[in-house]
């Protein structure tokens, strides 16, 4: 569903790409690197939560790592997406709203979106 939407929107992509080091020193692999028609690169991390579990607890750390990657990319990335899919999220509204703003800083370049919203934006070519 995601990949056809990206193609429809004019994006090319690479899957499972290491974009640098995570906070703490391990490799930071994102699910996708999109390339726009204008040549901009956009990292995308996708999290699926079918039932309540640990993926939910990893969201703040992933946002921090994506923000760090954008900041250290020397202009290669101007933004990144964290896509949340599935019905098992108890904190989805908190993450999609402004819940993290009082706890995290410097993550303005990271857009946290529902899977459906990401697909709609991809289809329209407006990521």
Model regions and ranges:
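Active-site beta-strand-loop-beta-strand hairpin of nuclease catalytic cores
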Residues: 28-44
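Amphipathic, interaction-prone secondary-structure segments
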Residues: 18-21, 26-31
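Short, solvent-exposed coil/turn elements at secondary-structure transition points
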Residues: 19, 49, 116-118
């Amino acid at each position: 569903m995601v990949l056809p939407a990206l193609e429809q929107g004019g994006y090319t992509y690479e899957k499972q790409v290491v974009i640098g080091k995570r906070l703490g020193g391990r490799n930071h692999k994102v699910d996708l690197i999109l390339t726009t028609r204008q040549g901009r690169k956009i990292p995308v991390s996708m999290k699926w939560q079918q039932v309540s579990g640990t993926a939910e607890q990893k969201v703040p750390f992933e946002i921090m790592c994506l923000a760090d990657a954008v900041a250290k990319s020397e202009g290669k990335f101007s933004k990144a997406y964290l896509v949340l899919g599935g019905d098992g999220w108890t904190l989805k509204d908190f993450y999609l709203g402004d819940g993290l703003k009082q706890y995290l800083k410097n993550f303005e370049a990271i857009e946290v979106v529902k899977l459906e919203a990401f697909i709609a934006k991809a289809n329209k070519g407006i990521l």
